[in-house]
Amino acid sequence: MGTSSAHSAAFHQSQIPNPQSQPLSTTTRSCNRLGILARMSAVLRTLTAPAARQIHRWVLGAFPRGQSTIDYDQPLGDPGIFGPDSVTWRVHSEFPGMLSGGLCALMLQLLHPRALAGVYDQSNFRADLIGRLRRTTNFVAGTTYAPRAEAEQLIARVRSIHSHIHGHTADGMPYDANDPQLLTWVHVTEAYGFLQGCRRYCRDVPAHIADRYYDEARRVAEALGAADVPASEAQVDAYFATVRGQLRMDTRSREVLDILTSIQLPVPAAGLSRGVFLGAGTALLPGWASDMLGRTTTQRAQAHASARLLRSLSPLFRTALRDGLSARACRRMQLPQTMLLEWPGAQ
């Protein structure tokens, strides 16, 4: 891939031209930037090491490794579905944005009666909500960072599982987990949550980068069978406006929300952690969704306080998780992890 090769060559070149004798090339400027970012990251790691170690243990307690058989290290040079030049690799590398955004997506999804019915009727979410969250996390991570063959196997496995999930809602409406429109709903809520989480808690996201993210992310949705998937921020806004008439908050929605908001992660300070991430997730909700969920003024104020706290902690998560799957994918491509700190095409 062109940009990846340029990054790799720039990072490994041993001779940097004298800026007084000739103009800096694009690859040289990229090398200089990555070098500065690497040094800044090293200083930050030193200063924040004790707190970062605690966060590292917290994350591994909530989402332990070893639950997936995917080899993220081989084969060398395999970019997977998205590759290192993608916005997706960068957005999905931000743990605070992904976890809060994923919770935001779940709260949006429970407002759709047909999307909720399959989960409500044909899953064990009541007894194993943590397991369900972990499996979803593994799917998103795998389709983002795994080699292409592994990612495609994940998609095929989910399609096979979906083929057995169908029935009728409490009101008699038919549902099918492979329904292209339901797949689009689930995808859009997730992509919206992840992007907003990244934007609010981790880094600035310019409008053209947001559009590129939505355009990239629909590859997985379409591979699963989704149809008419929005490909830009404006299209996502229009999609939400169109689908809102199908949404409602009912008894089932309330039950699922109560279970979600009482989840107990097997980590230290579980209640505090849950409060921060759930609050930060609800702070990402569109106003109309907060209204439908019946969020009170006090709850909204608490959510904004959680949002401010998570934003302040975001650099620590980045330091703590420098050995995560995004780093392994970068090594597979023989590229420095620091390249993920810049949006593609940054000069």
What function would you assign to each model-found segment?
Residues 33-185, 189-347:
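Mature, function-bearing regions of proteins
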Residues 1-3, 9-26, 347:
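Short, basic, low-complexity termini and linkers enriched in Ser/Thr/Gly/Pro
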